[in-house]
Amino acid sequence: MAIVHMKKLRLMVVRRQKDELLRDLMLLGCVQISEPDALLADAESAAVLRQESGNVTEVRSELTRLTAALKLLDKYAPVKSRLLSSRPEVTEADFLDDGAYRQELDAVAQIEELEAAVRRYNGEEAKLRSNMEALRPWQTLDLPLDLGETVRTRISLGMLPAAVDLAEAAKALADAAPESQLYEISSDKEQHYVLLICLKEELTEAITALRASGFTLANLNGAPGTAKQNIEDAQQQIADVIRRREQAETDIAAFAPHRDAFKLCIDRASVKLGRAEAEERLVGTESVVCMRGWLTAPEEAKLTAVLAKYDCAWDLADPTEDEYPEVPVKLQNNKFTEPLNMVTNMYSLPAYGTVDPNPLMAPFFILFYGIMMADMGYGLVMMIAALVALGKMKPKRGSKYFCELLFACGVSTFLLGIVTGGFFGNAVPTIVKMFGHDVKLGILTSPLLDPLTDTTQILIGAMVLGFIQLSTGMVVNMVMECRQGKVGDAIFNEGTWFVIFAGLALFVLKIGNIGGVPVVLCIGVLMLIYGSGREAKGFGKVTAVFGAVYNGLTGWFGDILSYSRLMALMLAGSVIAQVFNTLAAMPSSGGVTVVSMLIFIIIFLLGHLLNFGLNLLGCFVHDLRLQCLEFFGKFYVDGGKPFRPLEINTRYVDVENHNF
C-alpha cells in the first residue's frame, strides 16, 4: 500500500532485435520509455546518435479510419448495445495478427468508397432540389426556358420585389420601350416572377426602366424545355439518386458482421500507436538502439528474464533525490484501498518519494459517504448495482475502481442506515400507517440516531470525526518531516498544535492545572510563539507570531466546520425522502384503493429516484472536497507524473497474455 519503487533503466540492443524487444516490453507492460532529451543533450552523443522514427502518422490515420468505419456501421446498421455486457477475450495471437488487421483495413477502404458515394449522391440530390425549387415559380410558363429570342424580339425572365406595383412597372416600361410587354408568371411573399418581351433594339431601354424598380434577370442556365418538364426530369433524377444512395447505404450495412473485428482492430491500432510513439523516443546508430526509461522495481526479475533473450546491455539504478520530480508514479494498493485510486487520480498523484494517501483516505472517505447517505434502502441499491456491474461487465481499471468504490460506499450507507433507521426514508412506517396500523418496528421507528431530532449530536460527531482526520493528516506530515531530517519543523509546526489541543482538553477537564494555571496549554502557547518566530528577525517575529496564531486558529476552525456538511447532507437526504413518502401516502389518507396505491407507487419511485440520484452525486462531491481540500491540505504533496508504460491498453477487448 504505497507508491511503487521505480528503477532507472538504461538499455542498448542491436538494431535487428529492436522490433521484437519492443513487442516483449509491450507484453510485459512495466517499462515506461523516456524522451531522448537526456541522451541527445550531450554533444558527443548527439553527433553519433539519431532519433528513431516510428510510423506514427500512418498508424494514427489507420486508427482514425477504423473509428470512422465503426461509426458508419453504427449509423447504417445500428444494434442495441447491452448495458451489462463484458468485453470479449481474445488471444494474444489473434490480437497481434497482422494479416487479419490488413484484411479489415481493406474492408474499411470499401466502406470509405461507399460513404464517398453517399456523400456524392447527397450533393447531387441537394443540387437537383435547389434547381427544382428555382424552377417552381416558372412552372405555369408554357414557353421553353431556352427560348431567348425570335427574329426581332428578345424574351427575358426576371424578378421584381414583391413591394413593387406591377402596373406602375409596366407603365414605366411602356414609356421607355413602347413595343415592350411585361407579363406576371407568379408571385410569392418576396418577389414577382415576370416575363419581359421587347424588341431587340429596345432591350437596353426596357431593362434600364425596370431596374429602377429592382428588376433582376433570372439565371436558369438556358435549360431546354418548359419549367414543368424540367421539374419532372429533376424529380426523376432525384428518385434515381435516392435509389443509388440507399443501395450504397445498404452495401455499407452489409459490413455489419465486421463490427466486432473493427473494434478489435481499433484496439490493435491504439496499441500500435502507443508502440510507434515509444519507438520515436529511442535513439541509435546504424547497428544499435538506445533507450532510457523507468521500471517498476517489483518487475525487475521479469524484465531480466526477457532481456536475457536479446543481444543487449542494460543497467538499473535507483533514482537520486534530484531526479524525483521526473520519476513517474504508480500506486499499489490492496483490494480495500485500490478503488480510491479513482479519487486520487481525479485530484493529482502524489509526488514520488512522498506518501500514498489512499490507505489513509479510504476509511474516512467510505465512512463519510455512509454518514451523508445513511439509508439502508439506498445502500442495498448501491451494493446490488455494483455487484451486478462487476459480475456482468467485468470492468477494468477506472470502471472497476468505480464499481468497487460504489459497493464499499453502499455497505457504509447500509450500516449507517441501520444507525439512523432509514429505509427509503421512513417508507416502512409510512406504509404500515397507510394501512391503518401503528406498531413498533425496532430501529425503523426507534433508531439509535434520528437525523431530525438528534441533529446536535450528529453535528458534534461530524466535527469530532473531522478533528480526527485532520489530526491524522498532521501526524503523517510530522513523520514525513522527521524522515527528511526536519525534526524542528515537525515539533513546532504540527507538534505545537497537539500540545495546545491537549492543553485545552486538560483545562476543560480541570486536570494538570498548577495554581489555576493550565500548564500544558501555556507550554503549547510558548511553543507556538517560539516556533512561529524562530526564522523571523526583528519586528518580523511579532508579526509572525500574530500571523501564526490567527491563521492557525481560523484555519482549524474553518476546516473542522467544513465537516458539518456530513450532518447537513444526512439531514437533507432524510427529510427529502420523508417528504416524498408523505406525498405518496396522502391519496390513501381516506383509505387504500387501487388508484391510491398506483399513485403511491409512482410518487414513491420517482421521488426516491430523484433523491437517490442527487445524493449519490452530491455525497461524492462533498466527500471529495473534504479529502482533497481539508485532509490533503495537512500533508499531501502533489505533482506526481503518472506512470505510462508501453503496454496493451484496450477499450473493446481483453487480451489474454500467457507469456508473462
Regions found by a protein language model. Give the residues of each.
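Long, charged N-terminal accessory/stalk domains
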Residues: 1-361, 389, 396-399, 403
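Conserved, carboxylate-rich catalytic/transport cores that coordinate ions
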Residues: 2-7, 16-22, 26-33, 300-660
